[in-house]
Amino acid sequence: MEAHRFIEDFELVVAHLGMWPSFHDSEVLKLVLDRTHVAGSKELSPVLDLHLRGWVMTSEVTEQGFYKLHGEAVFHFRFEGVSSIQLEGFNNQNVLSALNLELMSHPDDASRQVLQVELEHCYEF
């Protein structure tokens, strides 16, 4: 399975952009860590909400010499059951080189898969 298919409602991103993007040059607008009740549960769970301004860059060039962007939007991802996080160097413009996703075995139960998410930074993020 492609890792992005592990994300609930990934089809909304694909429908909007026509594909699953790399999120190259996307900007992290907001990152929120919270302990909250996950839908259908009374237990608290660590949750990370990520808001990215993203698009698909085309090969077409505007009159101003910039690449044309397709489907520019703010995408909200909610990651539930977060077990580990590492943050480095937050600044005024947190541009990504890519949003890397990888399916891995759950550390406590090898029969379950979990999603590893890396916000590959262009700068110190």
Report residues per predicted region.
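Surface-exposed, interaction-prone regions used to assemble/regulate multi-protein complexes
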Residues: 1-125
